[in-house]
Amino acid sequence: MRTDKKNARNTKKKIVSTAWKLFYRQGYDNTTVDDIVYESGTSKGSFYHYFSGKDALLSTLSYLFDEKYEELTDALTPEMSCMDKLLFLNRELFRLIEDTIAIDLLAQLLSSQLVTRSEKHLLDHNRTYYKLLRTIIQEGQQSGELTSAASVSDIVKAYALFERALMYDWCLCDGEYSLSQYSANMLPMFLAGYRA
């Protein structure tokens, strides 16, 4: 049973990561379900088991982000301060966005999250993203690096809001500046407000 779940998760993961690579390389409109199935080495049956169509993949960007966070978790060391961990995660994710996500698709995801009546994936607190933030911020408060005047939940919410605001502005400005560079300059000032 466990192997079946792992295989299913791997199949879905292959479809999602392949789709986003193709969206970036060929453009969303020029990528077909057949392209995704072929490049991912899966089947149409598997594709339609997980997704109702190509449009359903737009809501998987947060899944792709969480996949990156899981990968980056191994690079976090106990010697790193909580601030260093947050700066590292932010830099790496924003580089991923700049290098592999088309601005129009990111903008589409952000705008769809504003109008959807269904699940708002970016706000799902069961995501790896939120779990990782909670862990880092709790560690920062326990070590005395971060203030305890604000709750872990409040700091997590403010941090996530900060990142979404930067992504939104970057899309609004049509990527005229480096998202990762701008964040590297602004995030330390934002986080300074939470130092103990």
Task: Locate the predicted segments by residue.
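Short hydrophobic/aromatic patch on the recognition helix
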Residues: 41-51
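Short secondary-structure transition hinges
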Residues: 94-134, 145
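All-alpha amphipathic helical-bundle segments outside canonical DNA-binding/catalytic cores
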Residues: 84, 121-126, 142-158, 177-181
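C-terminal peripheral helix-coil segments that are non-catalytic and often amphipathic
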Residues: 2, 88-95, 131, 135-143, ...
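Hydrophobic alpha-helical connector segments
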Residues: 60, 74-100, 152-159, 180
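Basic, helix-initiating cap at the start of DNA-binding domains
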Residues: 1-26, 30-42, 56
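Alpha-helical DNA-contacting segments of helix-turn-helix folds
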Residues: 51, 58-65
